[in-house]
Curated annotation (Swiss-Prot):
PANTHER family found in the cross-reference section: TRANSCRIPTIONAL REGULATOR MRAZ
Lineage of source species: Bacteria, Bacillati, Actinomycetota, Actinomycetes, Mycobacteriales
Compartment list: Cytoplasm, Nucleoid
Protein name in UniProt: Transcriptional regulator MraZ
GO cellular component, one term: nucleoid
Quaternary organization: Forms oligomers.
Native source species: Mycobacterium leprae (strain TN)
Record InterPro entries: MraZ, MraZ_C, MraZ_dom, MraZ_N, MraZ_sf, SpoVT-AbrB_dom, SpoVT-AbrB_sf
Length: 143
């Protein structure tokens, strides 16, 4: 399970060190893909394969489904962390997420998100006040 907030630095070669506590879950490889809110999602390979299988069952006659599948496939990069736990983010991913040297990696239960630190701060400022209301609506009767 991926939980917590971490603040690694992006180096000049586009490498980001993943938090040590997540590395064992990512040993089999990982998939970096474009996500909502101009962030990047990092899935363990097996988790991403399940997501891709579910997504591929969408109707190809639906233009929105086709667009989603195209963007999912084209915007995904397979990575294997090096011995220091670093992954290299593509120039396209760095541009999409507007990543600077200061990044934030957050656990999102079954995957990670990579944000530019300022973008994450701005997102938190905008959405923190609505956390209680959003959790009531999103979780409903679950908790």
């Amino acid at each position: 399970m991926f939980l917590g907030t971490h603040t690694p630095k992006l180096d000049d070669k586009g490498r980001l060190t993943l938090p040590a506590k997540f590395r064992d879950a990512l040993v089999g490889g990982l998939m970096v893909t474009k996500s909502q809110d101009h962030s990047l999602a990092v899935y363990p390979r097996a988790e991403f394969e399940q997501l891709a299988r579910r997504a591929s069952k969408m109707s190809r006659s639906n233009p929105e489904a086709r667009a989603f599948l195209r963007n999912l496939a084209a915007g995904t990069d397979e990575q294997h962390p090096d011995m220091q736990g670093r992954i290299t983010l593509s120039a396209d991913h760095r541009r999409y997420a507007n990543l600077s040297k200061d990044c934030v990696v957050i656990g999102a239960v079954d995957y990670l998100e990579i944000w530019d630190a300022q973008a994450w701060h701005d997102y938190q400022q905008t959405h923190e006040e609505n956390f209680s209301a959003a959790s009531d609506e999103a979780l409903g009767d679950i908790i």
